[in-house]
Amino acid sequence: MWRSLGLALALCLLPSGGTESQDQSSLCKQPPAWSIRDQDPMLNSNGSVTVVALLQASUYLCILQASKLEDLRVKLKKEGYSNISYIVVNHQGISSRLKYTHLKNKVSEHIPVYQQEENQTDVWTLLNGSKDDFLIYDRCGRLVYHLGLPFSFLTFPYVEEAIKIAYCEKKCGNCSLTTLKDEDFCKRVSLATVDKTVETPSPHYHHEHHHNHGHQHLGSSELSENQQPGAPNAPTHPAPPGLHHHHKHKGQHRQGHPENRDMPASEDLQDLQKKLCRKRCINQLLCKLPTDSELAPRSUCCHCRHLIFEKTGSAITUQCKENLPSLCSUQGLRAEENITESCQURLPPAAUQISQQLIPTEASASURUKNQAKKUEUPSN
C-alpha cells in the first residue's frame, strides 16, 4: 500500500509526463486532430479517460505489451475504473501492417486497434510519440501523461498509476464531462486510501539497507559497450522528476539525447534496469550439473549478484558480470517477456525442493517455480 502511495505521490508531482520527446507545452492540451480512415478515435472517446498506446505489430515486445494491456483493462474494470477508453495505434511501416491481425488478436473487442494508411500523415509523428509510448488523456481530451520506455513497460506500475490519477485527480483542472458516478467513485477511492494510511503502521524501510549492498547498483561503466543512452535502436526515456522519490535516490542528470533533454540519474536508471532484470521466479531453468554432484537435486531457483542490462532491438538481456561456478551454470528464459538471464543456482525453499521431486542421478534437472502459489520463491538480489 505504501508503494502505491509513493507512486501516486511521485506521479502527482510530475511537471512532465516522462518522455524526452514530449514538449511540455502539450501537457493539459488536446492533441493535434488525427483520424484513421473515416474514424476519429479521440472524438469517440470524449467523456472518458483515454489511453493511447503506440505499438508496433512487428515488434515482439509490443505484442506482449498488447496482451498485458488487456490484462490491465480487466484489472482496472474490476477495481471500478470503468469509464476508460483504450486505443492502440499500429506502426505505419509495411512489416507492421502485415502483422496487424496478430496485434489485434492480442486484445479483446474492448480495445480497438487502428491500422494507419500507408500515405496518411503518421499519427505517431503527430503525437510526438515513439514505439511503446502511452499517452493518457483526461475526460476532456487533455494530455495528462506521456510515458515512454522504460516507464511504459506494463510490468511496471507507472502506466496503471498514471491512469488512476488521470481518472480521479484534476491534473488539468475541472472537466465538465465528469459524471456524478465517476465523482462518487473517486471519493470512495480517496476515503479508502486515507483509511488505509491511518490504519497501516509506518513502514520499516528495509529496502534502503538492501540498497547498501555492493551488488545492488552498477556503475554506468558496466553497461554494454554497444548500449548508448539515446541510441535510436535502444531509446531510454528519462526518469520523470520525482518518479523515484520513494527510493530516495539522488544524482545529477546526464545529457545524451540529441535534443539535450535531461536524462535520468545513474542510480535511478540502474535501479530500473535491475527491476527489468530481477524476476523472483524465472519460469523454467535448466541446471547442468555433474551426475556425482551433491547439488544436483537441490537447484533451479537462481540468483545473480551482479546483473548487466542490455537492450538490443526488442530483446532485453540480463547477464551475470562474474564468472559462474563450474559446478553450476544456468541459462533461463522468460519467453513471455523475451528476457534472458544468466544466473547462479541457489538452494530453493524446502517446499520447492519437495515439489520438484528431482532425481539425484540425473545429469541435469529442471524445475518450475510456483511463484503465484507462493510455495517456491527464488532468493531476491
UniProtKB/Swiss-Prot annotation:
Listed GO MF terms: selenium binding
Compartments it resides in: Secreted
One Pfam family cited in the UniProt record for this chain: SelP_C
Gene Ontology CC: extracellular exosome; extracellular region; platelet dense granule lumen
Keywords: Glycoprotein, Phosphoprotein, Secreted, Selenium, Selenocysteine, Signal
Signal peptide: 1-19
Phosphoserine modifications at: S266
Glycosylation sites: N46, N83, N119, N128, N174, N338
Domain notes: The C-terminus is not required for endocytic uptake in the proximal tubule epithelium.
Protein name: Selenoprotein P
Organism: Homo sapiens
